[in-house]
Design a protein with these regions (language model features):
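Conserved ATPase-coupling elements of RecA-like P-loop NTPase cores
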Residues: 129-137, 142, 158-161
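Walker A/P-loop phosphate-binding element recognition
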Residues: 1-127, 143-151, 162-173
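Short gly/pro/ser/thr-enriched loop/turn and capping motifs at secondary-structure boundaries
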Residues: 154-157, 175
């Protein structure tokens, strides 16, 4: 497929501080040969998404095959997180898969997604994850993609089972 998705929202207009956190994400990205997953955990409204977007926009040159972005609605007011199958349908669509070629089964969708991104250098930003089970089907199978996950929770399953680098975030203090 020749589709190159560019799904990142605009970078935060005013992003300040968090230099250490940006450096930590840089260090994660520089571990060649591993899928980089940074579970940025912390309370609501402290800048997880802004940090992820600010970092991502600084590294667009490292992901020439595009970016995929989704708000997983892990802390949505109506309490209904986005199902992985729905996310995979939108990712496959963005990658140029025709609607009638998208499998109905979650595992088949995940396998097709992994196949399509296996050799690509892409960024996959999974924002506002509720738990590891929601994220796992959305992970690439190879080591060429960079994955950044934000969540209000630590997601220990992502760290333990998938080698994610956890980056905790605290409220910024005035400097």
């Amino acid at each position: 497929s020749s589709s190159v998705p560019r799904q990142l929202p605009a970078p935060p207009r005013w992003f300040t501080g968090r230099t250490d956190h940006l450096a930590a994400l840089d260090a994660d990205l520089n571990h060649q040969g591993t899928a980089v997953i940074s579970a940025i955990g912390g309370a609501g409204g402290i800048g997880k998404t802004w940090l992820a977007l600010a970092w991502a926009h600084r590294h667009l040159d490292r992901v020439p095959d595009g970016q995929l972005f989704v708000d997983l609605r892990g802390s949505s007011p109506d309490g209904t997180p986005t199902e992985p199958a729905v996310v995979l349908r939108s990712f496959l669509d963005a990658l140029g898969v025709l609607p009638d070629r998208i499998p109905s089964d979650l595992e088949a969708r995940a396998a097709l997604f992994r196949s399509l991104v296996a050799e690509k250098h892409m960024l996959i930003l999974l924002d506002n994850a509720v738990d590891t089970a929601q994220v796992t089907p959305l992970l690439p199978g190879g080591d060429t993609c960079t994955v950044v996950v934000t969540s209000r929770h630590r997601l220990p399953g992502l760290v333990n089972a998938h080698g994610a680098h956890h980056l905790g975030l605290d409220v910024l203090t005035n400097v």
